[in-house]
Amino acid sequence: MSRRHAAEKREVLPDPKFGNIVITKFMNSVMYAGKKSVAETIVYGALGLIEGKTKQDPLSVFVQALDNVMPTIEVRSRRVGGATYQVPVEVRSARRQALGIRWLITAARGRNEKTMTERLSAELLDASNNRGNAVKKREDVHKMAEANRAFSHYRW
């Protein structure tokens, strides 16, 4: 990895339906093997199901779900004189978003509904109501950080 300068961030274009950059990032994370149209169908289908079930704006449900899943603090390993400590650190905003998206998709893939569209819509609805595996993952990470609060002075 080059230490000269950080790689430039690529510009992410907003999605065609909602005009939202976060939805595009979400689609890109759902995508397998470069099949963007399949990912688009899955995400828009899930948001359509949410609109049908809740009669609410699907974008606001999505944003609420992502907010409920994004971690504010996590633990990172730090080696100090032969011992490795789990040191709690704050999460940067870009990483918060990336982790939230990743956890939502992983939780959706682990569900038992028949299609990915149904799994994703169910997980997003659960997450927007502070339930589901993605929210549980965030709670576990926060608990781990709280348990290791004694080592917070090793922060870097």
UniProtKB/Swiss-Prot annotation:
Keyword hit for Ubl conjugation: no
Keyword tags: Ribonucleoprotein, Ribosomal protein, RNA-binding, rRNA-binding, tRNA-binding
GO molecular function, a single term: rRNA binding
Biological-process GO terms, alphabetical: translation
PROSITE patterns (alphabetical): RIBOSOMAL_S7
InterPro entries in the record: Ribosomal_uS7, Ribosomal_uS7_bac/org-type, Ribosomal_uS7_CS, Ribosomal_uS7_dom, Ribosomal_uS7_dom_sf
Keyword hit for tRNA-binding: yes
Domain of life: Bacteria
GO cellular component: small ribosomal subunit
Classification via CDD domains: uS7_Bacteria
Membrane-spanning residues: none
Role played: One of the primary rRNA binding proteins, it binds directly to 16S rRNA where it nucleates assembly of the head domain of the 30S subunit. Is located at the subunit interface close to the decoding center, probably blocks exit of the E-site tRNA.
NCBIfam families attached to this UniProt entry: rpsG_bact
Subunit annotation: Part of the 30S ribosomal subunit. Contacts proteins S9 and S11.
Family label: Belongs to the universal ribosomal protein uS7 family.
The protein's name: Small ribosomal subunit protein uS7
Organism: Rhodopseudomonas palustris (strain BisA53)
Lineage: Bacteria, Pseudomonadati, Pseudomonadota, Alphaproteobacteria, Hyphomicrobiales
Name of the gene encoding the protein in the UniProt record: rpsG
